[in-house]
Amino acid sequence: QEKERQEQERIARMKSLGDILVLTPKEFEELTGKILEANGFHDVQIVGGSGDLGIDIFAWDQFGYKHAVQCKRYAPGNTVGSPTMQTFFGMMFHHQVQKGIFVTTSTFSRPAIDLAIQRDIQLIDGNQLIELLERLQQSSPLNSSLKIADKNQ
């Protein structure tokens, strides 16, 4: 429980892509998992790391569909291209998953976007990631308790 509270505090302090870029790949995957849970996904399984076969997270939506999630913590200007998107789609096929979500701290190239549209892969770029992080912070139990504390002062 203490670990969860510390995690919530760390998330509450994140304000920019710079704060996300200093996370380790595993921490970035864990943050993405929390964002997915806050947006209605359940049974979020973080499988990233070496040997993850190109899938970092599996998560189920409210309709019971399994989603494969790829997380790429790229520096600004390091665009996700179509070869990376093709590899992700290949791994979705390998794992027999129909729905994909690709999350990056940077942006996607036009060919990668076109491929994602063809393959029904949802894209979350750095700007959208910050918006989702802000929503997660607003819905956090820690944030609620901080608001109560502020009102009492």
Question: Where do the language-model regions lie?
Answer:
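Mixed-charge (Asp/Glu-Lys/Arg
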Residues: 1-153
